[in-house]
A protein has these predicted regions:
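Non-catalytic cap/lid and distal C-terminal segments of serine-dependent acyl enzymes
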Residues: 2-372
């Protein structure tokens, strides 16, 4: 007997068709999910076509403020605003890495108008910077300087290795730090071949690295980000020779910068390029500068120096201890020391120290984000 089945009435066949369809749906969905995860992983590790590396990055700096730095937009007419809107011109930033929260580290080549030096500067803004509730707010800035050669890279820009950027976010979320914009310039004009370095200073006859760090780099940040007008929103941090440069910058320019985290620092200038320039060398000596600042004791020049060292840094400890004993907490010079048990002379140790209290201490002395 022949059985003529009506279309769609075979439970088994119909079930089989539905099962196959569901399986294909699951397979396609699974492939899509795996693809998204893989793309995210590849992007995170900067692999292949999924990477944002090298792509243009905007920090929302397209609309400069009016009047050479008065707050722009709705706040342009408020000369008493605490916020400095981007002054322009906008720099060409390119992505070097993307963090898990979507924030980006970007780099530009800055042609320093005041120093005459041309070099790379890496920047990063915390996620809070693009939070709508802070859309008109000025953010504090930290200029982060490396030790070692300090050229052609600045190792603080590698969040995958040292986690400075993600740590800033972590400390902010924990109420232990400000949401700093990070500026990470090269420290020296060329590699430190044969132990040659520039002490972050304007050594006669040499590239003006002091002006580069204290004027050109801040000008770049002011041109492209919403910042704090006053010195209360500007700080340095650095390790080793970078700590010296940051320490010296704050003591030399207390009108521009308020605080520094100086980790395993050199205390006095010692580049051989100073030979024959003793006067200029003294003008860039933190001991001399601290002594002068204390003697003058002018209002509005208080500086906050957060020193750090690991307990295994035998060559660093005596010099830092001596500086603090001589100049610490006298007049406008305020100091704090973070000892990192078992710590050595390296950036990993110093991140630990920042987490232990140095970041919170300088953040308590600063402002931001500030409303217009």
């Amino acid at each position: 007997m022949t059985y003529h089945q009506q279309p769609g009435t075979c439970p088994t066949c119909g079930h089989r068709r539905g099962s196959r369809g569901k399986k294909w749906t699951i397979i396609v969905a699974s492939i899509a999910v795996v693809g998204l995860i893989a793309a995210g992983v590849l992007n995170y590790f900067k692999i292949g076509p999924f990477s944002d590396k090298g792509k243009p990055v905007s920090f929302g700096q397209e609309q400069p403020g009016n009047g050479g730095g008065q707050a722009g937009g709705a706040n342009a007419a408020k000369p008493d605003s605490k916020v400095l809107m981007p002054t322009g011109p906008a720099a060409e930033f390119k992505n070097t890495s993307t963090l898990s929260d979507g924030t980006q580290v970007a780099v530009t080549t800055l042609d320093g108008k005041k120093s005459g030096f041309k070099g790379k500067v890496w920047v990063w803004a915390p996620k809070a910077y693009k939070d709508p509730k802070f859309k008109d707010h000025g953010f504090p800035v930290m200029i982060a300087l490396p030790g070692g050669p300090g050229f052609p890279n600045n190792y603080w820009m590698d969040d995958g290795g040292l986690h400075l950027e993600s740590s800033v976010t972590k400390w902010y979320n924990e109420g232990k730090g400000k949401p700093f914009i990070l500026a990470m310039p090269v420290l020296n004009p060329q590699p430190d071949t044969g132990g040659l370095y520039w002490d972050g200073s304007d050594i006669p006859g040499q590239p003006k690295m002091g002006t580069w760090l204290t004027e050109d780099v801040p000008d770049l940040i002011k041109a492209n980000f919403r910042t704090v007008k006053s010195r209360d929103g500007w700080a340095f941090m650095g390790s080793s020779s970078g700590a010296f440069a940051g320490l010296k910058a704050v003591l030399k320019h207390p009108d521009k910068f308020k605080a520094v985290i100086a980790s395993g620092p050199d205390i006095v200038p010692d580049s051989r390029l100073w030979n024959g320039h003793e006067k200029e060398k003294a003008e860039n000596n933190p001991e001399v500068l601290a002594k002068q600042l204390i003697a003058a004791n002018k209002p509005g020049t208080d500086v906050y120096l957060a020193f750090q060292y690991g307990t295994k840094e035998s060559s660093v400890i005596p010099h830092v201890d001596k500086f603090i004993a001589t100049y610490g907490n006298k007049g406008p010079v305020h100091t704090r020391l973070q000892k990192i048990e078992g710590g050595k002379h390296n950036a990993v140790t110093y991140i630990q120290g920042m987490d232990m209290g140095s970041m919170q201490w300088i953040s308590e002395q600063m402002v931001g984000p500030v409303a217009p």
